[in-house]
Amino acid sequence: MKLAITLALVTLALLCSPASAGICPRFAHVIENLLLGTPSSYETSLKEFEPDDTMKDAGMQMKKVLDSLPQTTRENIMKLTEKIVKSPLCM
């Protein structure tokens, strides 16, 4: 659970950074697959970013932890992320 909260906070910090001109659609796709997709779809969404094996392994470990959460919890984390990103505080 701590990992999921950490991930959500890091994601929101990145997406709401004043330096960001907007949300990278590909990054949003990766996060969606991380939270709601299959391990295979998550791994596929990472390929274009060319992570090294250590990064891929870490991402897959995180995916396993997140997949252990109930589906509704993961859906609500995604909704929370979307709500915060669309907030006037992040624009």
Curated annotation (Swiss-Prot):
Gene3D superfamilies from the UniProt entry: Secretoglobin
Locations listed in the record: Secreted
Predominant place of localization: secreted
Highest taxon, organism lineage: Eukaryota
Residues making up the signal peptide according to the UniProt record: 1-21
Record flagged with keyword Signal: yes
Quaternary structure and partners: Antiparallel homodimer; disulfide-linked. Interaction with LMBR1L is controversial.
Source species: Oryctolagus cuniculus
Entry's Gene Ontology molecular function annotations: phospholipase A2 inhibitor activity; steroid binding
Keywords linked to the UniProt accession: Disulfide bond, Lipid-binding, Phospholipase A2 inhibitor, Secreted, Signal, Steroid-binding
Family: Belongs to the secretoglobin family.
A biological process term (GO) from this entry: signal transduction
Summary of the function given for this chain in its UniProt record: Uteroglobin binds progesterone specifically and with high affinity. It may regulate progesterone concentrations reaching the blastocyst. It is also a potent inhibitor of phospholipase A2.
Designated name of the protein: Uteroglobin
Induction context: By progesterone.
SMART domains (alphabetical): UTG
One Gene Ontology cellular component annotation held by this UniProt entry: extracellular space
